[in-house]
From Swiss-Prot:
Protein's job: Nucleoside triphosphate pyrophosphatase that hydrolyzes dTTP and UTP. May have a dual role in cell division arrest and in preventing the incorporation of modified nucleotides into cellular nucleic acids.
Protein name stated in the entry: dTTP/UTP pyrophosphatase
Signal peptide span: none
Keywords for this protein: Cytoplasm, Hydrolase, Nucleotide metabolism
Length: 193
């Protein structure tokens, strides 16, 4: 599939094993390339829906000087947004606990921004999914944190893990977006390269 991509070397610029797994599911050959210490800050003035795309574009710009003419780069960033604002990745157990406690018994938004870039083209998009969590008890939150240590995940949880099985009541939107890469939309966009 996607014969148009055969002219490119596809590069996924991500440390995320979930993004690697999801992109593999599209049956696209790619390599992973990671630059450490990319600035993931954003201006306070931008809307929450724009934050992930802003960061995904910043990541792409960091890679641009090293890109070969035949490379197609994919970058992404995911945030969790609640009534209290943006949740990124928790720095420690205490932050992860506070995040899960805040998500418990509420609906939150998961927004992923994706940037696809070649030397001549740069396309970006965002996908939003609403996730409804059941009420989580302290015992359930502590069990999850002790066993899964979700410190590399926006909002402090992985929907594909135990907490998703027992805590997610409903999703409106893409499940794969909540995992970190909206592969259906990505596939549609890749058709145009």
């Amino acid at each position: 599939m996607l014969e148009n991509l055969k002219k490119y070397k596809i590069v996924l610029a991500s440390n995320s094993p979930r993004r690697r797994n999801l992109l593999s599911g599209l049956d696209i050959d790619f390599e992973v390339r990671v630059i450490s210490d990319i600035d993931e800050s954003y201006p306070d003035s931008i809307d929450s829906m724009e934050i992930p795309l802003y960061i995904a574009r910043s990541k792409a710009e960091a890679y641009k000087p090293t890109m070969a003419d035949d490379e197609l780069l994919i970058t992404a960033d995911t945030i969790v947004w609640t009534f209290d604002g943006v949740m990124g990745k928790p720095a420690n157990r205490e932050e992860a606990y506070a995040m899960l406690h805040a998500l418990s018994d509420h609906v939150h938004q998961v927004i992923t921004g994706v940037c696809i870039m070649t030397k001549d083209k740069n396309v970006g998009f965002s996908v939003e999914s609403a996730v409804c969590f059941a009420k989580l008890g302290d015992e359930e939150i502590n069990y999850y944190l002790d066993k899964y240590k979700p410190y590399d995940k926006a909002g402090g949880y992985g929907i594909q893990e135990w907490i998703g099985y027992i805590g997610v009541e409903a999703i409106n939107g893409s499940f794969y977006n909540v995992m970190g890469l909206p592969v259906q939309k990505l596939y549609q966009e890749l058709k145009h390269f």
